Amino acid sequence: MKYILVTGGVISGIGKGIIASSIGTILKSCGLRVTAIKIDPYINIDAGTFSPYEHGEVFVLNDGGEVDLDLGNYERFLDINLYKDNNITTGKIYQHVINKERHGDYLGKTVQVVPHITDAVQEWVMNQAKVPVDDDRKEPQICVIELGGTIGDIEGMPFVEAFRQFQFKAKRENFCNIHVSLVPQPNATGEQKTKPTQNSVRALRGLGLSPDLIVCRSAKPIEMAVKEKISMFCHVEPEQVIFIHDVSSTYRVPILLEEQGIIKYFKQRLNLPIDDQPSDLLMKWKKMADRYERLLKVCSIALVGKYTKLSDCYASVFKALEHSALAINHKLDLMYIDSTELERSTEVENSVKYHQAWHKLCKADGILVPGGFGIRGTEGKLQAISWARTKKKPFLGVCLGMQLAVVEFARNCLNWKDANSTEFDPDTKSPVVIDMPEHNPGDMGGTMRLGKRRTVFKTQNSILRKLYGDEMFVEERHRHRYEVNPELTHCFEEKGLKFVGHDTEGNRMEMIELENHPYFVGVQFHPEFSSRPMKPSPPYLGLLLAATGTLNAYLQRGCKLSPSESYSDLSDDSSPEKEFPKSETS
């Protein structure tokens, strides 16, 4: 087993996760089996109870693990399925050690950070690195480990010490450290500064780790003189200094790394049995990145949510939309709309914000209402859903978005004016959305219906079923405490809102479709968590197809995107116009 540790310096949030994912992608393209581990130094057991403004979205894994969004990057880049134990937190490690102490496993010894916490970290990493994450269920050959935060943070010290010890246990030829640092460029001088990187590397060495590669992040391409300066003052060879500047898409990052000889370096440093030349997989990434930058046609989607001030709150939703847009040769224009700004109260308090929000909603080609919790902003979401339904605008509701679509339909089509979810009004006389008591025992963390669950289609005549390849069932990831009231579904179906999918017992309603509408769809699960760059999520793909007026043609062709089922470079005789009609006339 080979281990690659990715650490960060200067500041957090400079792209360690994308760089770690890109390194994994390059190694996978060389024919190696790669897994990934993310270490978060916070004391929380997992990310399940975080506000989205704290760390961005909560990513859900197949086994129900609620984890850091970086694990979503690993899954998308590497096309693997990780587990909750691939996300290590300080809380998990301390809980593990304290439980062992309570069971008497330490035989009365004083339990300390060194050696007990550090040993637990090493043991966890070695055990989890062996767990298969590919469909072939074979043991991985390389484990990429990202240490969250920055070197010098007090929270991360036990983990740094654990890896200082681990590098000797694993042996030099099996352990490699990549340090990601920022090279700022102050506007006052325009000069790229290396001092923060020098100090960061010095701090790393002072803690017992020495970088094998220094990845320098910058806004603009870094000059060769800067590379030589970092090489000299950080005591590494020039080829061990890698530059990654801001690029138009994250698909370009693996290519930048490969162009700077990282495959050759890993082959020598870790004695890997690989070729120096990139494989077909990396060539597909190159073609995909080139295609992304050449797209001319634009599809605009309005995302109506309550956490719109931070784009990371909807990271997987954005990626799922981007994957689908790229698959149909369109550039995505995602417009974030704060749902509270669509409400009547905003018109009174700030009419400019109100009209700007509605202007964005009206000009969008499609509307998406994602998941969320709490009553704030729900009336604005209901307004957006009502507008999409009445104006026949393509709409996708995910989790809470589906539940609110049911509430809106009940109020305006069934004339149940007090219809609501018991999450927002426990005493409503028309509880069209109810809680699931078996998933709400009292504690907040880990008490929802989580992870991969099977959804069975009820009917052959379903757009979603066709988008999923006419399968009898699908397996997607869930994260919810509330469900549509199954006792009232017949009232909706009589008026044209069809429940086309349910759980294996037939009790929980998981998919809705509205009759006589181009695309009005809701799903109780989160399909964005399973979307991949080369395998876009079907519900999101359907939204983009409907928004560009090509859904019917796609369905009539048997749900085939192009002559090639994976991303092929578009040549002169394989243009998007030939593969998709420009629009459908109504």
UniProtKB/Swiss-Prot annotation:
Q: Which GO terms describe its biological process?
A: 'de novo' CTP biosynthetic process; CTP biosynthetic process; pyrimidine nucleobase biosynthetic process
Q: What keywords are assigned to this protein? A: ATP-binding, Glutamine amidotransferase, Ligase, Nucleotide-binding, Pyrimidine biosynthesis
Q: What class of enzyme is it?
A: ligase
Q: Which PROSITE patterns match?
A: GATASE_TYPE_1
- Catalytic residues (UniProt): C399, H526, E528
User: Origin, by domain of life?
Assistant: Eukaryota
* Span list, region Disordered: 562-586
Its pathway, per UniProt, is:
Pyrimidine metabolism; CTP biosynthesis via de novo pathway; CTP from UDP: step 2/2
What EC number(s) is this enzyme filed under? 6.3.4.2
Q: Which InterPro entries match?
A: Class_I_gatase-like, CTP_synthase, CTP_synthase_N, GATASE, GATase1_CTP_Synthase, P-loop_NTPase
An MF annotation (GO) of this entry: identical protein binding
Catalysed reactions, semicolon-separated: UTP + L-glutamine + ATP + H2O = CTP + L-glutamate + ADP + phosphate + 2 H(+)
Q: Which GO terms describe its cellular component?
A: cytoophidium; cytoplasm
Task: Describe the location of the Glutamine amidotransferase type-1 domain by residue ranges.
Answer: 300-554
Basic and acidic residues compositional bias, start-end: 575-586
UniProt-listed CDD domains = CTPS_N (cd03113), GATase1_CTP_Synthase (cd01746)
The record's function comment reads: Catalyzes the ATP-dependent amination of UTP to CTP with either L-glutamine or ammonia as the source of nitrogen. Constitutes the rate-limiting enzyme in the synthesis of cytosine nucleotides.
Q: Which family does it belong to?
A: Belongs to the CTP synthase family.
What name is this protein filed under? CTP synthase 2
